[in-house]
Amino acid sequence: MKGTKKIFIICCVFLAIIIIGDSCQKFSVLNTNPNNVTPDQASPDYLMAGVLANSAMWYGNLGSGVISGAMQQTYQDAWGSTFSDYEWDQQGFDWTGNYHILANDKLLLQKAQGYQWNFHQGVALVMRGFGFANIADFWGDAPDSMALNGSLTGTNNQYPPFDSQESIYENAIADFKAAIPYFSGSMADHPEITPITQSSDVFYGGDPVKWKKLAYSLLLRYYLRLSSKMDEQANVESVAANVFQSIDDDWMMPFPGQDQGSSYQFCEKFNDASGYHRNKMCGTLTMKLKDLKDPRIVIMAQPIATPSVVDASQFAIGDNTTLTTIVNGIRYINPAAAAANNYKQFDPATYTTDRPYGALRNTIMNLYDTSSVYVGIPISYDNYVDFEYNINGSGVQSTSLSNYVSYLRTDIYDNPSGPLLAQRLASYSEICFDLAEAAQKGWNVGGTAATWYNKGIKASFDTWQVFGSYQSDVDNYYGCVKDYNTYIGQPSVAYDGTLQRIMEQKWIASWQACNEAYMDWRRTGLPALTIGWGSYRGQIPLRFGYNNSELSNNPANAQIAIDKLVPSTYNNTDGNNSSWSKFWLLQGTNKPW
């Protein structure tokens, strides 16, 4: 009943967003809506609804989309080169929408200050810090202190200078700190929190206690983000006791599922069916889950429709032309025909050299995988033929249908909404792994690295109901352990004192919310991800390039920021404004490469 009520509330919020608008540009159309609401007349509650929901959709879609591809958890075949081959360029990533949200947040803060509504001021400060920090995370230097002043005259208002990435982080941290006092007490101590406020808060239903934990948790996140550039031990230790305490504190928004804009982005209901079918499991994650006998695989992946076995006895002696045959629901592969036609069994240790690329495309080796009922596509397999991986034989690139590669689990992810579908922005599991990392450094965070590490794994299992609603699926899959204690007791999982072990499990736990996994990989190089031979530049990119709209509208200030970027050997002919250039956060760290 509680979950149903929350979905209803969020549906109402999305209706409110339609009325209020989600950007400065959209405000101009408000005069035509029958409610005749203008931004200045809009209630802070409805402004808050738009800021929260739109922030969740942007951040969440990125984490389950292109960044999930970058972190090799999911794979988009058939023209998915941005997703799975790292073909990033500045045309594909535009921050205009981020600044639209921040403009609304600025108005929310101003109105909340005018009404002296503490709760709303705190929310606006958290979201301002979060919004600008996201821009710094993905682009680097950007307009901040002089941004959002387009209605004012003056050169710096019309063409705002770019603040340094470092100062944007400092400002975000200051916002998170400034927000905390506004969340003092409980809901009963905040007369400004009305039923409308509760409905408009799509994350926590107007609960200041949870928002306060969130502010502290974001401080922890960004102190660790900066720890490779400056000493953050005292800061981390100062917030450790006040962060999320359970999965009930997770920062998330369930999908209303009423239309394409409020639904899980890859479901078929409001999209072309190929959108769901193109979004498959990446071999990097499926291999790791199988190696660890990890039961979370049953939550993530759909078993392949037709399992494969290599068996020469199913074919006539001397037959080296018949590649496959299906008998009683099993596909048999003819080893003689496979060898004669340049097919080879997938081997995770050698696959990057088993299949030559580029000038040798006419002699490429096609790979097949018979290892399990869960099969992912190897990262950067080759965007021209990845839809045919594992001897699919469909010949139809546009549909991406396959009986031999795992989609995301159909009854969960091919839906606009559902009990496990949400935009996930921060989690208790993430916080546990953050504290494990801090403890591994020798910092005092109220527990050992092993304790926090195990809690992080447990929180991930609980979040996805692995040993709850899906216990029977776990029990029915032969390739995984059946309970938490057995899982963490395995030598391949048990905490071994290394940062690598923490980051590997944190990466797995970031399923469908990979933004933090990407940030962690950038600053630590962990987990160590193999790059496929079909990748655009031979390495995972580090940032979003400044979009042409910004280069055209604010060229002088953009160029100053571009000149501060440090190019790498992977830039090719991009110039400094490359997704493989290093910004301040990575300069001098030798990470991730």
Model segments located where?
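Bacterial Sec-dependent N-terminal signal peptides
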Residues: 1-32
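Membrane-proximal, proline-rich intrinsically disordered regions
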Residues: 24-78, 89, 111-114, 496, ...
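Beta-strand acidic-aromatic groove motif in beta-rich domains, primarily in extracellular
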Residues: 60-69, 139-142, 234, 519
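Short coil/turn segments at secondary-structure boundaries
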Residues: 64-67, 302-303, 514-523
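Substrate-binding/catalytic groove segments of enzymes
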Residues: 186-190, 230-231, 467, 509-519, ...
